[in-house]
């Protein structure tokens, strides 16, 4: 997941934005402040969604379904179970989103200091690119979270239906 389409898409878009920034010669400091403000305004909502989804899967799963999901996916002893894969997708997404939020909050504080430097353009461009990459990556990781919540719901539905069908077949036999 770390080297997924979300990662490469975020990296590609960040490079494209970087090229446009160098060509356009806009006010990098204002652009940095705006980028940080946008990220800080949307990321807590996305982070809350991911934490809520993680809590939903960890806290509200039926024990027999979670037992089935805890079986290793492969034949080797070190293969992860689907439950571990599901949990790791959420954990990585949440960690990256927390790091993105920390980066943007720190950049916000630094922007408010109004420091001047001979390296201001380079520092501002680096901050912009770091903020854009991490925020795009955090947003695109939400796709994997939604996908895993959906798959978890489908597995819960399947296990419940299978249990009902097994009970019906026992009654018939």
Give the location of each predicted region.
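Cytosolic/matrix-facing juxtamembrane and C-terminal tails of multi-pass cellular membrane proteins
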Residues: 148-173
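Short membrane-interface loop/juxtamembrane segments of multi-pass integral membrane proteins
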Residues: 70-89
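Membrane-water interface of transmembrane alpha-helices
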Residues: 53-69
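Select subsegments of transmembrane alpha-helices in polytopic membrane proteins
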Residues: 5-13, 88-100
């Amino acid at each position: 997941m770390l080297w997924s389409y979300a990662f490469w898409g975020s990296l590609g878009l960040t490079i494209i934005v970087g090229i446009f920034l160098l060509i356009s010669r806009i006010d990098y400091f204002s652009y940095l402040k705006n980028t940080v403000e946008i990220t800080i305004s949307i990321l807590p909502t996305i982070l809350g969604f991911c934490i809520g989804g993680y809590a939903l899967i960890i806290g509200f799963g039926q024990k027999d379904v979670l037992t089935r999901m805890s079986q290793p996916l492969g034949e080797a002893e070190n293969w992860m179970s689907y439950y571990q894969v599901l949990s790791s997708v959420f954990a990585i997404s949440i960690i990256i989103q927390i790091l993105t939020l920390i980066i943007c909050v720190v950049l916000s504080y630094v922007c408010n200091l109004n420091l001047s430097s001979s390296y201001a353009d380079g520092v501002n461009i680096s901050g912009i690119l770091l903020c854009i990459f991490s925020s795009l990556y955090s947003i695109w990781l939400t796709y994997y979270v939604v996908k895993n919540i959906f798959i978890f719901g489908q597995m819960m539905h399947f296990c419940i239906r299978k249990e009902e069908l097994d009970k019906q077949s026992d009654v018939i036999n």
